[in-house]
């Protein structure tokens, strides 16, 4: 076994075949991935898939044999017949039995994934923020002093960003790439101005324009929240799971 996850085995044959498929896909994308990185990525993906499939079973999901066969029949027809399916399986490192098992697991995992992401609410606590982004620490401190002296934030924001006037729009927690900016934004009161925040991009000064505990998520933010929910679920399950890796 390459690993066991809560007593369910991940065979070396299955792992090796998936690794070969992964490397082939990366090569087709002209991506150079080391054997070590490829092995880690494949193992993590397989463990996540098994945990999701186990979660589906625990939640009461069960695909019937007839439904699974219908999926196989549809795929067989799509490929052009049973011989074509056998050729495809062979070319991708599958046997009939291993492909059937992998398909069932994939269906279970997809069901659980949909259950997790569909449970994410379409609204969230969000702030509407305006920023002044600068690339020099001294200039940032100078602008902050102007603001403290009564200068208009919107006027200064327009000076440094004539098009968008520094408007970041609405966003929830967990959406921004920089946690320092997000933490500062959610710690401010409406109308309050932050100190200078150093980021990987430069130096930010923020002003919270509005806050709404139930503001509708934008499509991008909703997708990000769904992805975060899925990552969190897998991380929690992984922490609680009994996972034994082969030496």
Predicted regions and their residues:
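Short, low-complexity, Pro/Ser/Thr/Gly-rich segments in the mature regions of secreted, periplasmic
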Residues: 232-247
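Peptidyl-prolyl cis-trans isomerase
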Residues: 29-33, 142-181, 209-216
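Surface-exposed patches in mature extracellular/periplasmic domains of secreted proteins
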Residues: 31-32, 58-65, 155-159, 194-197, ...
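Proteostasis/folding factors centered on peptidyl-prolyl cis-trans isomerases
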Residues: 90-131, 158-160, 179-219
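Extended amphipathic alpha-helical interaction segments
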Residues: 110, 114, 118-146, 155, ...
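Extracytoplasmic
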Residues: 2-5, 10, 37, 63, ...
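FKBP-type peptidyl-prolyl cis-trans isomerase
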Residues: 1-24, 51, 56, 107-112, ...
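N-terminal targeting/tethering segments
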Residues: 1-97
């Amino acid at each position: 076994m390459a690993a066991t996850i809560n007593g369910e085995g991940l065979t070396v044959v299955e792992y090796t075949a998936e690794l070969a498929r992964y490397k082939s896909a990366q090569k087709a994308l002209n991506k150079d991935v080391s054997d070590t990185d490829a092995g880690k990525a494949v193992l993590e993906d397989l463990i996540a898939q098994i945990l999701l499939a186990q979660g589906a079973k625990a939640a009461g999901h069960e695909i019937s044999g007839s439904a699974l066969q219908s999926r196989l029949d549809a795929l067989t027809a799509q490929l052009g017949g049973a011989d074509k399916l056998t050729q495809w399986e062979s070319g991708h490192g599958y046997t009939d039995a291993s492909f059937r098992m992998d398909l069932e697991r994939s269906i279970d995992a997809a069901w659980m994934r949909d259950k997790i992401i569909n449970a994410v609410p379409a609204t969230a606590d969000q702030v509407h923020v305006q920023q002044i982004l600068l690339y020099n620490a001294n200039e940032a401190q100078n602008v902050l002093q102007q603001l403290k002296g009564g200068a208009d934030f919107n006027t200064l924001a327009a000076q440094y960003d004539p098009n968008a006037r520094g408007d970041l729009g609405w966003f929830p927690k967990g959406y921004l790439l920089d946690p320092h900016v997000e933490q500062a934004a959610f710690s401010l009161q409406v109308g309050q101005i932050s100190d200078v925040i150093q980021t990987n991009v430069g130096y930010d000064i923020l002003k919270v324009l509005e806050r709404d505990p139930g503001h509708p998520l934008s499509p991008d933010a909703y997708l990000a929240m769904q992805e975060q929910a899925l990552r969190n679920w897998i991380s929690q399950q992984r922490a609680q799971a009994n996972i034994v890796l082969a030496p």
